[in-house]
A protein has these predicted regions:
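Short, structured beta-strand/loop micro-motifs enriched in basic residues and often containing a Trp
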Residues: 1-4
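Accessory alpha-helical DNA-binding modules that contact the DNA backbone or grooves
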Residues: 12, 24-212
Length: 212
């Protein structure tokens, strides 16, 4: 995913590369065996369009990631929902990847709030969904409404906002409404919330798509 590294190492399609473990698990490409490079090895760059929705991509100005910029990309929505429902965020049991796939593909869920509008009839319309399983999903969604603000903020997937910064924001503002109304300048005055993070938070809550 790091095209800066691809360019730095001059990695091409068809190359043989040397890999070592970074940390203890993650494989890291450290060098290219250029003496074994095939004649037809081709250079490549970041994708210009999202492979799922076809929208243009942009490089994260504060990092190395290339992202799809569409707010309606189904692949992005699925990943956002998986993150939102994960154990460390809203902890919605029984809302796994397979179910999320169906909910998005059938148009039943288009944003986080749609999860809380699901009913038994919508779930029973899905493949391999029995009454008992559907009720368990609804019960888990209902239970998630009691999660603390910090977990909810961490679950939204705001760029650069992790669990620690979510807890700082929740403690400082106390409510979602107060955070939504905060200015970018106010956010930058909070300890451990720098300008980049403040800008990301402010822009998230001033995007109409995120306020539905």
């Amino acid at each position: 995913h790091n095209f800066d590294e691809v360019e730095r190492l001059d990695i091409r399609i068809g190359d043989f590369v040397i890999i070592e473990k970074a940390g203890e698990i993650i494989p890291q490409v450290v060098a290219v065996k250029k003496d074994e490079r095939p004649r037809d090895a081709k250079a490549f760059g970041p994708p210009e369009k999202c492979p799922v929705c076809g929208s243009k991509t942009e490089k994260d100005p504060a990092g190395v990631y290339v992202r799809c910029v569409s707010t309606s990309c189904p692949a992005q929505l699925k990943e956002k929902l998986r993150h939102f429902a994960a154990r460390d965020q809203m902890d919605i049991e029984n809302l796994g990847p397979a179910l999320i796939e169906q909910l998005v593909d059938k148009g039943l869920v288009k944003d986080f709030s749609d999860l809380y509008r699901l009913d038994i009839f919508a779930l029973l319309s899905l493949e391999r969904m029995a009454q008992k399983s559907a009720q368990k999903v609804l019960d888990a969604i209902e239970k998630s409404k009691s999660q603390p603000l910090a977990r909810f903020l961490a679950g939204l997937g705001i760029l650069h906002v992790g669990q620690q910064s979510a807890e700082i924001l929740a403690e400082h503002f106390g409510s979602l409404e107060s955070l939504k109304n905060a200015t970018e300048e106010e956010l930058t005055t909070i300890e451990q919330i720098g300008p980049v993070l403040a800008k990301s938070i402010y822009e998230y809550f001033h995007n109409p798509q995120n306020l539905k």
